[in-house]
Amino acid sequence: MITSTVRLDRTIVIRARPATVFEFFTSTPDWAAWWGAGSTIDARPGGQLLIRHPNGVEVAGEVIDVRAPERIVFTYGYASGKPIPLGGSQVTIRLDGHPAGTLLQLTHEFSDAAQRDHHVQGWRFQLSLFANAVANKVNAAAAETVDRWFAAWSDPQATSREATLDAIGTKDIQVFDKFSCLAGEADVKAHFVAVHWFMPGLRLERRGDIRHCQAHVLADWVAIAKDGQERGRGTNLFVLDADGRIAEVTGFWA
């Protein structure tokens, strides 16, 4: 039992909806995705949780309160009893909506400052893993989204091109490169009309695998003219929103 409350507070923004973020505190596969293989959670009041770190250290606790998708509270202590005995500290996670997705607020209450100081870097690291685990799930289809963007860019048929853009982009999408400074879906669609008017037959194709980190995606591309000759190449940085849709594209020509 906690005899005094020394707090560690940390806040991060996750590019995902609260309901999705909350799954990483209630689903054992998602829980293990950011804590490590063998970690489990029974997300009901009185349910048990286990954290199994890669170095063999084990943490266990009991779920005290669950209010999906806004709040979960659980005890936190080490199986060895050191530096925190079982039941010796308490973690509260609060989730709120945010323009970018979800605001996560963590409060870890300890019995003394030494315990708190021991966990400052640990939570900084662990919540970084958490942010990546959530983003990897939300954006599991990022490569397909990127390919659909390049396909839309290359599509000479306005109806199908615009339908693709509606499906993969946000209404306020922004696009920047050496030939573009665009704001909003209508602006992007008009730009694509001009592309096909002045450069008929030009297409963009992805080259190699995408690289993804927390809703930011890098994709290399090549521009191929109607005659099959390469006309340029470069890299695009895509920023995805909380639903995995394209919110921003910045192109860098090689």
Regions found by a protein language model. Give the residues of each.
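Short, solvent-exposed secondary-structure boundary/capping segments
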Residues: 70-77
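Short amphipathic
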Residues: 6-14
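A beta-strand edge to alpha-helix "cap/lid" segment located at domain peripheries
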Residues: 81-133, 190, 194-254
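A solvent-exposed, acidic/Ser-Thr-rich amphipathic alpha-helical stretch
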Residues: 18, 37-52, 59-61, 67, ...
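Amphipathic alpha-helical segments
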Residues: 15-33
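Hydrophobic pocket/interface hotspot
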Residues: 21-22, 31, 49, 63, ...
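Short acidic-aromatic low-complexity motifs
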Residues: 15-19, 139-171
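Residue-level recognition of conserved beta-strand positions in structured domain cores
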Residues: 53, 76, 106-108, 177, ...
